[in-house]
Every structure is written in C-alpha cells, then in structure tokens.
Amino acid sequence: MYAIVKTGGKQYKVAEGDFVKVEKIEGEPGSSVALTPILLVDGADVTTKAADLAKVSVTAEIVEAVKGPKIKILKYKNKTGYKKRQGHRQQLTVLKITGIK
C-alpha cells in the first residue's frame, strides 16, 4: 500500500517503513507528525475521491534534521569587474513513515 502526500510544495510517494527527506518541518526528533493533504492512496484499489481521502491518515516520525547539498550562486557582469558569490544549503527533515490508515 502506498500514498502520495504533499508537503513543502512537493509531492512524495510514500509507503510504510520508507525514509523520506522533505522540506523542514518543525518538531523534535522522535516526535510524530501527520502528513496532509493526501492526494492518492493505492491499496486494494486506487482512491482519489476527496471524501474517501478524508478518512485516510499518513503518520510519520521525525528521524533527524539535516542540510541539503551546497548550492553555489555566482553573479557576474562583463567588463565591469563585478562578481558576487553566494551559497545556500536548504534545511531538510528526514521522516520515517509509520502508518497509512
């Protein structure tokens, strides 16, 4: 059984026992969170109706908070000597899917 959930502006296909890296979610490692909205559930049959999806819940446990890879940004203007370097590391949360009910 799997579900498609939306969190942090992205959609993830999750099944029970999966580890997923998502955009930062507030909470301590070891705490439980409910992932909403649920867009699709596939068990014995595929469910996409909003009334049926309202009865389904996806729960996950926060494993750890990590940072993504460094993204390098360089601005450059020709003939003027203007260069600007910048970097960024996105904050991520690792979740373990504990149940789809």
From Swiss-Prot:
Q: Which UniProt keywords apply?
A: Ribonucleoprotein, Ribosomal protein, RNA-binding, rRNA-binding
InterPro entries the UniProt entry points to: bL21-like, bL21-like_sf, Ribosomal_bL21, Ribosomal_bL21_CS
Any one biological process term the GO annotation gives: translation
Instruction: Mention any one GO cellular component term assigned to this protein in its UniProt record.
Output: ribosome
What PROSITE patterns does the entry give? RIBOSOMAL_L21 (PS01169)
Q: Which domain of life is it from?
A: Bacteria
Record SUPFAM superfamilies: L21p-like
Q: Spell out the molecular function terms from Gene Ontology.
A: rRNA binding; structural constituent of ribosome
Entries under HAMAP family matching the protein = Ribosomal_bL21
Q: How does it associate, per the subunit comment?
A: Part of the 50S ribosomal subunit. Contacts protein L20.
Q: What does this protein do?
A: This protein binds to 23S rRNA in the presence of protein L20.
In the record, the note on similarity to other proteins reads: Belongs to the bacterial ribosomal protein bL21 family.
Quote the protein name from its UniProt record: Large ribosomal subunit protein bL21
Q: Which organism is it from?
A: Corynebacterium diphtheriae (strain ATCC 700971 / NCTC 13129 / Biotype gravis)
Q: Which gene encodes it?
A: rplU
